[in-house]
Amino acid sequence: MLPIDVTDLWPLSRDLLIQILEDRCSDRFVCERIWERLGYREVAAGAWGAGPETPAEWSEAFPEAPQLIAERPASVRLTRSIAKPHKQLLKQQLAFPGYRIGELYPRRTRRATAVNWLLAWLAERSEPLMEQGPLAPELPAPSNPVFGHPGDLPVT
């Protein structure tokens, strides 16, 4: 368990996680919710770096906060960091059926991984998922999910 002061973290809620799954917020917002829970801290305007609470396996591989949606190595590490008992939380807690064949894009599947990781983070701390809470700045779903929202980095 990371010694992170949870009062400094953006609150997680069912509504927020659905907003992420429905691609109605920026990739950057999604990354920031995970970075703060991994102990990364904003070190300059828009730049995040590993902090003293960042697990060594993350800070050594990614001294600067990784682009979890845009970059495959970071997404793979995030997937592998979810403990086996928590791999199905997306389906169990949010009744998420997955994406249909025509909806399968790396950005979307990586967002689903991010949501599952956030659910696992709560589960590891025995914290409940709130029904409602603050949402991300609302964006319309992108017209082309491959490219995402204006400002989202290209997926590699």
Feature-to-residue mapping (PLM):
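Low-complexity intrinsically disordered segments
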Residues: 59-156
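N-terminal organelle transit peptides
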Residues: 1-7
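Conserved, aromatic- and glycine-enriched, well-ordered alpha/beta core segments
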Residues: 10-100
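Low-complexity, disordered linker/stalk regions enriched in Pro/Thr/Ser/Gly
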Residues: 6, 15, 19-23, 115-120, ...
